[in-house]
């Protein structure tokens, strides 16, 4: 396992974060819910290409955003099969503890 991915996963597991991104010695964290952490990074114009991410839950929408942001790899305790397939299609390694058919939003 890549050292940056390992650090992202360890930080995610130890903290109360919804997202952790790691690239080389750079570590970013977020406690925002849903897609907000990813959308915030896009809106701010942050260069996150080549980072490894550990995210609480990854569905297809989040997977599309990770592709747009240039992720080098994505881990989530829960990931939809569609998200894993999409990330794999873009040659982004995807790892999950549990794969599910769908990710539902808070209202559903």
Report each predicted region and the residues it spans.
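Conserved mixed alpha/beta catalytic, RNA-binding, or beta-rich assembly cores of soluble enzyme
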Residues: 1-77, 97-108
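A short helix->loop->beta-strand "cap" motif at the edges of active sites that frequently abuts
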Residues: 71, 91-92
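Short, polar loop motifs at secondary-structure junctions
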Residues: 78-82
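A generic, well-ordered mixed alpha/beta core segment in the N-terminal half of proteins
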Residues: 84, 93-95
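Short, polar/acidic, helix-capping and beta-turn segments at strand->helix junctions
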Residues: 87
């Amino acid at each position: 396992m890549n050292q940056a991915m390992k650090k992202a996963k360890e930080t995610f597991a130890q903290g109360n974060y919804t997202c952790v991104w790691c690239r080389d010695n750079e570590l970013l964290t977020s406690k925002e819910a849903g897609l907000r952490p990813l959308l915030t990074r896009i809106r701010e114009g942050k260069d996150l290409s080549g980072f490894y991410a550990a995210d609480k839950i990854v569905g297809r929408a989040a997977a599309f955003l990770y592709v747009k942001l240039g992720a080098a790899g994505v881990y989530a305790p829960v990931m939809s099969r569609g998200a894993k397939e999409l990330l794999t299609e873009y040659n982004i390694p995807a790892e999950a503890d549990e794969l599910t058919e769908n990710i539902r939003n808070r209202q559903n």
